[in-house]
């Protein structure tokens, strides 16, 4: 199975086939405009502007599962992302990325990667403690743990890497490797 077999909901509620992105390197992520990690939008936009002409796309899926609930519509989330952070990459309808109601795309992404921790910074230890409160066995499963978890998909449609929100330093190297 490849990413191209999935359909997702666009901002307008219509189905979007990921086969529309055949041949592109994709960075698929979950986000929340009110997240502590929302500052990453600026760096992600910089990467998008730098590599988009080389067959690189970022696909952004807003998500309310990690305590950063935004009560507005999908369109309001999009406008906030554009106004606050200058986002120009594609955004889709709000989704669940883990649990019973997770969309098939994120189930597949999670099942085909593994969680490798949050790193070793002081913030990483705090995040681990917070995530453990929700899932005592969080280290033993590949579920998405936080907003701004990113999955890198190669040009053939297969997921090749996963980046936790604390892992921005490796991200550009990963993108370059698959372009």
Regions found by a protein language model. Name each.
Residues 160-179:
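Non-catalytic, surface beta->alpha helical segment in thiol-disulfide oxidoreductase systems
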Residues 24-25, 33-34, 38-62, 81-85:
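Conserved helix-turn-beta segment immediately C-terminal to the redox Cys motif
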Residues 86-166:
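Thiol/selenol-based redox catalytic cores and closely related redox-interacting motifs
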Residues 1-19, 37-39:
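N-terminal "domain-start" segment that seeds a small globular fold
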């Amino acid at each position: 199975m490849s990413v191209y077999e999935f359909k997702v909901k666009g901002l307008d509620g219509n189905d979007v086939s990921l086969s529309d992105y055949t041949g592109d390197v994709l960075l698929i992520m979950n986000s929340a405009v009110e997240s502590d990690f929302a500052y990453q939008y600026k760096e992600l936009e910089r990467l998008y502007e730098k590599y988009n002409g080389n067959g690189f796309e970022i696909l952004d899926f807003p998500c309310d599962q990690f305590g950063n609930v935004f009560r507005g519509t999908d369109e309001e989330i999009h406008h906030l992302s554009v106004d606050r952070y200058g986002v120009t990459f594609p955004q889709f309808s709000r989704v669940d990325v883990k649990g019973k109601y997770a969309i098939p795309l994120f189930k597949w992404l999670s099942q085909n990667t593994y969680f490798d921790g949050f790193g070793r910074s002081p913030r990483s230890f705090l995040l681990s403690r917070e995530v453990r409160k929700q899932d005592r066995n969080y280290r033993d499963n590949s579920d998405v743990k936080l907003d701004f978890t990113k999955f890198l998909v190669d040009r053939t449609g297969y997921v090749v890497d996963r980046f936790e929100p604390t892992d921005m330093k490796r991200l550009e190297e990963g993108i370059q490797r698959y372009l």
